[in-house]
C-alpha cells in the first residue's frame, strides 16, 4: 500500500541514500583492484564514504511524512526504520575507524571493509522488507557476508572453525525461513507481508504457525536462547575485532524487523524466548572466565530484555537498542585498545581471551571500560539505567508485571559477572603492572573512545529530546 507523501525532497534524499551506498561499494571495489598495498587508505576511504551516507540518513529522518513502499512493494520505509538505519551506519563507521589505525597484533586485511559494506546493505534493507522473496534474499546477503567476515583471517584455525560453524548453523536457519515462506505461500498465494496480514485479518483464518517457524529461524539467527549455543562458540573462536562486529549488527537488524512486524508473530513464542534468554544469560556466565563468552552472554541477556519492548511495541525499544549498541561497541574498542599494552598475547588474532588479561597501565582507558560495565549493570545516571527503566515502565503500564519483575531479578544476578570484570579492572588503578608495554594509545582510537564516552555519560541530558523525537516519528 502506498501512502501519500508530503514532500518530494524526502523521497529524493532516501533514493540518494541508497544510490550513494551502492556507489560507495562500486568505488571501493575498483579502488581495491588498483591499490592493494595501502590498506589503511582503503579503510579510510570506506569511513569517509560511509560518513556521507550517514549524513544522508540523518537528513532523511523527517516527521512530516507517512510510510511509502519501494520496488513493487518489496520494501516499506516507515518512520520506525529511520533511527535503525542511522544507528547501523554509525556502528559500522565506529568499528571501521579502528582499521584506519596501526595495530600491533591484528594484520590489516583489504577485504574486511568491503565485506562490511556489503553486509551493511543487507543490514539496513532487512528491517524494511515487505515481501517474503526479498526477505530471504536480504537475510542471506547479510548472513553470507558475515560468514566470510568471520573467516577472513583464514590462517587462524579458530577463525576458520568459527566461520564453518557459523555457516552450518546459519544454513539451518535459512532452511527454516524457506520452509516458512513456502507454507505461507501455499496457504494464501501471497508473498507481500502487508497483503498477508490483511488476508488473515479479513478471513479470520488462524494459520500463524508458518510465521512461528519464521520467528524461530530469526531467533536462531540472533543466537537467543534456547538456540544460542552456536553463537557462544562462534564469538569465542572468532578474532577479537570480528567478534565486536558480528555480535551486534545482525542482532540489531533482525530484532528491528521483528519489532516493526510484531503483528505477524506469536507473542507466546517471544515471551518464551525472553524467559529462557534472561535465565540462561544471567546464570551461565557466573562460571566463565573467557571475556568474549561473558560479553556474548551479556548480549543474549540484553536482547532478551529487548524482546519485552518488542512485545509492548514501545518506544523504549529505540532507547535501549541505541544505548546498548553504543555501549557494546565502546567496550570492544576499549578491549582492543588494551591489547596494545599486552606483552604476552593469548594469540595473534585474539590477544586477550580471559578476564585476568585485562591489565592496562592507562587509567583513563580502565575507567572508561568500568563506566561501560556500570551502564550494563544499570547504574544511574548512565544510559543502561534509563534503558531498563523505560522498558520496565512500559511493561507495567501494559500489565506485564511478572516480566518486569523478571528483568529486575536477573539484572541483579548478572551484576555479579560484571562485577568480576570490574574487580580486575579496578586492580589496575592501584597496582603497578610490569607485564605490560608502556606505549601510548593510538590518538585516533583514543579520540573515538572519548567521543563515545561523552555520548554515554551525557545520555541523560539529551534523552528528553530523543524521546520527543521518537514520539513525533510515531505520531
UniProtKB/Swiss-Prot annotation:
EC assignment? 7.1.1.2
Please name the GO terms that the record assigns under molecular function.
NADH dehydrogenase (ubiquinone) activity
Catalysed conversion reaction: a ubiquinone + NADH + 5 H(+)(in) = a ubiquinol + NAD(+) + 4 H(+)(out)
Supply the InterPro entries for this chain: ND/Mrp_TM
Chief subcellular location equals: mitochondrion
Q: What sections of the protein cross the membrane?
A: 45-65, 82-102, 112-132, 133-153, 162-182, 198-220, 240-260, 262-282, 291-311, 318-338, 365-385, 402-422, 447-467
> Origin, by domain of life?
Eukaryota
- Report how it sits in the membrane: Multi-pass membrane protein
Compartments in which it is found = Mitochondrion inner membrane
Is Calcium found in the keyword set?
no
Record function comment: Core subunit of the mitochondrial membrane respiratory chain NADH dehydrogenase (Complex I) that is believed to belong to the minimal assembly required for catalysis. Complex I functions in the transfer of electrons from NADH to the respiratory chain. The immediate electron acceptor for the enzyme is believed to be ubiquinone.
The Swiss-Prot or TrEMBL record describes its family as follows: Belongs to the complex I subunit 2 family.
Show the PANTHER family listed in the entry.
Answer: NADH DEHYDROGENASE (PTHR22773)
Q: What is this protein's record name?
A: NADH-ubiquinone oxidoreductase chain 2
Species, as recorded: Candida albicans (strain SC5314 / ATCC MYA-2876)
Its organism's taxonomic lineage begins at:
Eukaryota, Fungi, Dikarya, Ascomycota, Saccharomycotina
